Design a protein with these regions (language model features):
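Alpha-helical segments in soluble extracytoplasmic regions
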Residues: 64-153, 163-209
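Low-complexity, Pro/Ser/Thr/Gly/Ala-rich intrinsically disordered linkers and tails that serve as
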Residues: 1-4
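Generic low-polarity alpha-helical segments
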Residues: 42, 56, 123-125
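Short intrinsically disordered, low-complexity segments
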Residues: 36-39, 52-56, 80, 109-113
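Short extracytoplasmic/periplasmic juxtamembrane "stem" segments immediately C-terminal to an N-terminal membrane anchor
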Residues: 48-70
Length: 209
């Protein structure tokens, strides 16, 4: 039969209606909300069960970073004591000039190692940035002072001092970095000591570092 001659569809055939989509969308949204609530409660419950909160974890990590820094400071105190002893002997043209030169050279190397460890200190981002910068500046200057004083000791060994120390280029070169180190250590101590007291760690004066 030709297409144009097809009889019209029977009026008795059942009609198909599309179901409205709104209830389906609303139901899907409700399912998503319920699932989100369940997940959130589960997460909150697991956090409560473990007894930790983000702030607690942050405080613990900050304390660990402070403990790590305290260990570096203890090494610095040991170095400073050895440097002071060598400097006293040098100023008096003492009997241990060669040992003084070695002590000062070792102290300079130790400062550099401390700087490297400070730069990679775990959790350093949790400590005050200004405090770490003050300590970095102070240790850099102290390393330069130790190097200059070691050179001064070598000069006295070579030229002799005859019971009295003599100023030379190496000694004069140490003056500027020594002042810089003093400023940095004082600023560092003012920030470190309150933090150390909070965590029960040793406090320091600038002349100990």
């Amino acid at each position: 039969m030709l297409a144009g001659l097809r009889p019209p569809p029977s009026s008795g055939a059942p009609r198909r209606f599309r179901r409205p989509l709104v209830p389906v969308i609303v139901a899907a949204a409700l399912v998503a909300v319920v699932a989100g609530i369940v997940i959130f409660r589960g997460h909150s419950g697991s956090t409560a069960a473990s007894g930790t909160t983000p702030s607690t974890v942050s405080q613990d990590a900050r304390r660990q970073a402070a403990v790590g820094l305290s260990g570096l400071l203890a090494q610095s105190v040991t170095d400073r004591a050895a440097v002071n002893e060598a400097a006293v002997d040098l100023r008096g043209c003492g009997p241990s000039l060669r040992q003084d030169a070695r002590t000062l050279a070792r102290a300079a190397s130790s400062r550099q190692r401390l700087l490297s460890r400070l730069g990679s200190l775990p959790g350093r981002s949790l400590l005050p940035a200004a405090m770490l910068q003050d300590l970095t500046s102070a240790w850099q200057a102290s390393a330069q002072v130790d190097t200059d004083l070691a050179g001064w000791a070598d000069d006295m060994i070579t030229r002799g001092c005859h019971g009295k120390s003599r100023s030379d280029a190496h000694l004069r070169a140490s003056y500027a970095p020594e002042s810089q180190a003093t400023v940095g250590k004082r600023a560092f101590a003012s920030l470190w000591n309150p933090l150390a007291r909070r965590y029960g760690l040793p406090t320091y004066q600038r002349n100990q570092l």
